[in-house]
Amino acid sequence: MNHMTVAASEQSFQAVFNHLRDGFHETASGGGDFGPFSASYDVGVRLEGGTIDLQNNNTVLLSELDIVYDPLILRLGIDIPEICVGGFCIIPSPFGCILRAPRICIFSADPDIQIDLDLSGLIESEISGTFSIDTRYFVDPGRPAGMSDHDAQDADVPNKWQLFLNPGWLDIDLIDIADTVGNILDAAIDAAIDGLLGWLPGWARSLIRAILGPIVALVRAILDIADDIQEWLSNLLGISLGLFNTVVTLVADYFASRYPFLEFEDPIQVLDPGVNLIAVKVPIRDLDVLVTDDEMVVTANVGA
Amino acid sequence: MKARVNTCAVQQSCLQSSALGVLGSIAHPVGRPGEYSGRVMQGKSQVAEFSLHAGPDVDATQVTIDLARIAGSPLVGQPYKAHKYSVNSDGYLMLFVSEGLGGFWVQLSSQGTYRSRVVFDSRRLKSGDLFIATLIRPGTHQAKMPRAVAAIRVRAPEASDKAFQPPPPAGMTCTKTGFVPKRLEVYATQGIVFGFETTSRVQIDLTKPAPARSAKSRRSARWRGRPDIRR
């Protein structure tokens, strides 16, 4: 028989989880070189929604936790081809060209363009998973050795029992990429090329655009975008850049080791201080957690 | 974002066979086996020299020399190096300028047993020589040789779903009576090959640039109707 038992209903657990969820705001960046182009991202991630379902196997099922990408900036770096004139055959023969005009490059050195895509709020994904509840004892590193428990409470460095949500498995599902991404990409390509050629005389800009051909189609080809830009973007972000893995890792790390969803001071205060009386504190030992279908039950013993 | 534009090519409005610059090149048939030496001049200064071996034993039918690349800068004390080339004796010496202000001309001399003899001077092109011009700026150009002119209209490529590929080079011949044909219409970046039936030189000037064409046509909405005025 335990000395102390505290129970929290599923609703209460959901409220505590919501509070913890709302504190999540992480940032990450990454990138890679993929031959004809490079890509990198800067992302800020928030969490919304998410339903808690307590399970009688001592776990917590989390479903439909929405990932809000705000901001999500995807940067694409592209080498557009050299633009050269000449190189045509002047004297052909059945055995090949006898005399060929020299090739003169009028726009060279593999000019780079960078296309910035602001994808904030255009990608919907959600996380589901199960968590067990880990109990850990925390000794504040800021607490000097020999400091009394009362002094530690006053200095806000008390020892604590902490409960963490330790993920068993987490899945991230890409729900949707907005249709407007295609239009955003096309407009960004046009703007980048205009910026690159902007200082040239108008006739030279028109000539270079004519030699390059439809620039949007050219850049899409360099990026290896087939018909389905959503699928391309999903592969780029999810597989090539590993964004979704990064997000899952951030979420798992946040819940499992950075922020406890519940914590108790040790020793716990059971009577407030009175006149000429100090607060009464009792030490907590053998903290344990049991999850059932209906509630989470925390048990503990009192003892030195 | 970085870009390198061949500004001399973009800004050039005059091409001369006698003072070679970007977008112009000269092909000279070597003709005879032997050892040759070349002097590369820029204005009045010698900026490079080269030797050329021409023989039936050489496979290459063309030796291409970028005069801008081999030229030293005598004004800043940069000495030029001697360059060695070889070509089939039935092949061509191709001279061009990849970048810079240009103004190059070349003398080629055959190295005889006792003395050298100038066999080619790029300021005076002869039968068999070719001057190749690649005009990139749309507009009307005038080709000139002593006592003769011809008009060349350079058209801008049409906007298309495909990358622009210029047609094969057009031809023009410099004869004793002038250019044949006297008028030519080409697309920007399409080559023009000038042949010579008489000793001459060619200069091409931009006389009237094509009017600037906006990349996107402007559209504006207009409301037409009778204002409803009530008194």
Model-derived segments and spans:
Chain B
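Extracytoplasmic copper-binding redox domains, predominantly the cupredoxin/blue-copper superfamily
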Residues: 1-231
